[in-house]
Amino acid sequence: MAILKWKRSRWYSSDEISFAGIVTKLPTANNTTTSNSKTCALGTSEGVRRATTSTKRPRTEPEHRNTHHPNKLLRGDSVDSVNCGVISAAACTNQTRAVSCPATTPIIHLKGDANILKCLRYRLSKYKQLYEQVSSTWHWTCTDGKHKNAIVTLTYISTSQRDDFLNTVKIPNTVSVSTGYMTI
């Protein structure tokens, strides 16, 4: 029964069905033949069986509509987004960049052979007071096969802590050091 109700609700798009009546002779003043055509609402006493239609809620528009693709929603801000734009290290002349965007932290990327970086990360446990966090060894994806360098990222509370780290810890010559800022 539920399937029948569902099928009927799909067939009818509104609460009215329009149909042509039977041509009959109606007693009129001129005694002419007329066509009895009328619209009968569902569920009235006109002899039409009531078809149960499901009550449909009006479709609400989503908050973010994509103007280029109307069937797709716009994504909101990404998880790591902030109000600061991305500035490459080469084009950046702002020395107070960490202050300009409060959700950034000073970092160092150590790049080199994966095994050397793993040993270095183990040795860094002696200097825990000189950094905030250290990542595991990671790689960039979708790069050409020529560059097999692994990366370890270290975060710091301040640039002075990062400078103390660089002045204290001996970094192997085969490991390159890149300083910068990261959005946290």
UniProtKB/Swiss-Prot annotation:
GO terms for molecular function: DNA binding; DNA-binding transcription factor activity. It is found in: Host nucleus. The keyword Transmembrane helix does not apply. GO terms for cellular component: host cell nucleus. InterPro entries: E2/EBNA1_C_sf (IPR035975), Nucleotide-bd_a/b_plait_sf (IPR012677), Papillomavirus_E2_C (IPR000427). Residues 33-74 are annotated as: Disordered. Keywords: Host nucleus. GO terms for biological process: regulation of DNA replication. Pfam families: PPV_E2_C (PF00511). Belongs to the papillomaviridae E8^E2C protein family. Plays a role in limiting the replication of viral DNA in keratinocytes. Recruits the host NCoR/SMRT complex to viral replication foci to mediate repression of both viral replication and transcription. This is Protein E8^E2C. It comes from Human papillomavirus 31.
